[in-house]
Design a protein with these regions (language model features):
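Conserved HGGG/HGGXW glycine-rich cap/lid loop of the alpha/beta-hydrolase fold
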Residues: 53-99
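Active-site signature of alpha/beta-hydrolase-fold catalytic machinery across serine-
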Residues: 78, 142-146
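Conserved catalytic-core motifs of eukaryotic protein kinase domains, centered on the activation segment
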Residues: 73-75, 100-106, 165-168
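Gly/Ala-rich beta-loop-alpha elbow adjacent to hydrolase catalytic centers
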Residues: 131-140
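Flexible "cap/lid" loop of the alpha/beta hydrolase fold
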Residues: 145-146, 151-184
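Conserved alpha/beta-hydrolase catalytic His-Asp/Glu region
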Residues: 166-167, 190-217
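Alpha/beta-hydrolase fold catalytic core
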Residues: 1-61, 87
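Active-site loop/oxyanion-hole signature of alpha/beta-hydrolase fold enzymes
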Residues: 91-131
Length: 217
């Protein structure tokens, strides 16, 4: 009984500490307001509100960001000014990313395929070219295949293999999902995966050819 009480006490203390750490990290991470809400619009999608912005005039071009733990529409911030000179540029935060809703559910590639199609159909409302990067390329290709009349030219930037998105979840994946859905523990793991040093290491090793082009945050 004593051992059980001690273990319970240690577990509780650990969770309290992680909760406090999460609060501090969250406050520091949002202090610069990098994901500001200015000029943002909301697409009331059936699985949650989707944040997006519209810039410029001309042929429509939605920009679909990568699907990593630290991804959001801010990835496109360096090219929007030039691209918007001749296009209507739509930058979207995918469900669970940026300023969009984070529903208590597992977001699948099929769900993102539906999101892209619904956004083009209900918000843009005309045939559009589309630009996508990284892991998101797979479900955008699926969306284009489902409704080819909605899309014109498609630009893929560093696309991941479509085969990776057709794999069934393994037991290891299901265990990881269970742990990540434990709010305090999952949030702490997310913060560790998205810490500034880790992001900059990715930029230096894989993200940028020229390190001098890495933006300061």
């Amino acid at each position: 009984l004593t051992i059980a009480l001690t273990a319970t006490g240690l577990a509780s203390a650990t969770l309290v500490s992680l909760f406090a750490i999460n609060k501090v990290i969250g406050k520091i991470a949002t202090s610069k307001d990098l994901l500001n809400t200015r000029n943002k619009e909301i697409f009331n999608w059936r699985f949650g509100d989707i944040s997006y912005s519209v810039t410029g005039e001309g042929k429509p071009v939605p920009l679909i960001h990568n699907l990593k733990e630290d991804s959001s529409s801010i990835e496109w911030s360096q090219i929007i000014p030039e691209l918007s000179m001749n296009h209507t540029v739509y930058t979207i935060d995918l469900l669970g990313c940026g300023l969009s809703d984070r529903p208590d559910m597992i977001c699948t590639s099929f769900m993102y395929t539906q999101l892209v199609g619904d956004f083009v159909r209900d918000v843009i409302k005309k045939k559009t070219n589309i630009v996508v990067t990284g892991k998101s390329a797979a479900f955008v290709l699926e969306a284009c295949s489902n409704e080819p009349d909605l899309y014109g030219d498609l630009i893929l930037i560093n696309p991941d293999s479509i085969r990776n998105f057709r794999k069934a979840p393994s037991k290891r994946t299901k265990t990881a999902v269970f742990i990540l859905k434990l709010k305090i523990i999952g949030t702490f793991i997310y913060h560790m995966m998205c810490r500034k040093k880790k992001i900059y290491n990715y930029f230096e090793e894989d993200g940028f050819y020229d390190k001098e082009n890495i933006p300061e945050a």
